[in-house]
Amino acid sequence: MDDIHYLIVSTLVAYIGIHIACWWGNRWKERAKHAYMVIGQHGQSAEEREWGYRNALLAGEQKAEKFYMCSAMEKFMEEKPLTPHPFDDGLGGTIPFVFYDYYLPMKIRNYGTEGQKELSWVVNEFKEGRVDASGYFLTAIAKLGLSGTLTILFMPCSNERNYYIRFRALAKEFSRYKELDPELYSMTYISVRKSKHRSTDRKEISVDSNIVVDANVVGRQNCILIDDVCTTGDSIRTHIAELRNYGVRVVGVVCLGRTVRILTKEQIMKQAEKDSELIF
């Protein structure tokens, strides 16, 4: 009888102990995820903030998901900011492509790093002609590593008015540098198309060209093509091919931003777990 009584008491003690341990573990985990989140928000370095968001996510803090994605964006994207990457020119070759930083769509912008949010704001201001963004573009152009006088060409916009609003001030700034030859008046607009950055469905936009290349750039051989944002790169490739028809050779592409991919929860969690394993 004593043995049975002892067994019952031991079982109850073990049961209570397990529940206390689980309760304490859950309580610790709850506190830990908030502590990690604070580190993510207020860390002194980019690495520290990424570490905080990653551990908050792994501890169960769902709010950390997109914060971690943005803080670790270079691990999810093939291209890195201010680093030359081969760009398929659509003509069977590649040319160097450089962008300043990642551009975040509005639905995830609040999750971005300070640098990403600043760049995304600059892109929008540049589109509307409120800033020339010349410092950003000049930094990116320097990373191409090209020599000689560079002819600067600008991507066509939906209409002539938007084109000059966007690029006139930038072209003026470029003209101050002897190694840059901006050709703002390199095309004639013959029609108006739907604006891409204001469209909710880019697939609905016509790919037909709404410009004709002017004679003053025909045959130019050392050209850089400038645009605000690269998303798929299809528009850039289309214009490169159009320029080639006029004997124009594009040797580099520079954009303010590279639009990021919106990742699934599974993709983000997989990378977080991979990073955690690498540390240990």
Question: Where on the chain are the PLM-derived regions?
Answer:
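Feature marks short, highly hydrophobic, charge-poor N-terminal signal-anchor/signal peptide-like helices
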Residues: 1-10
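Alpha-helical membrane-embedded segments
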Residues: 12-19
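Transmembrane-cytosolic junction motif
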Residues: 19-37
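Active-site-facing substrate-recognition patch
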Residues: 40, 50-54, 58-149, 188-221, ...
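PRPP/pyrophosphate-binding module of the type I phosphoribosyltransferase fold
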Residues: 148, 185-189, 195-280
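Short glycine-rich phosphate-binding loop at a beta-alpha junction
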Residues: 149-158
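Residue-level signal for inorganic ion chemistry
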Residues: 153, 171, 253
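Charged helix-capping and loop-helix junction motifs
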Residues: 166-172
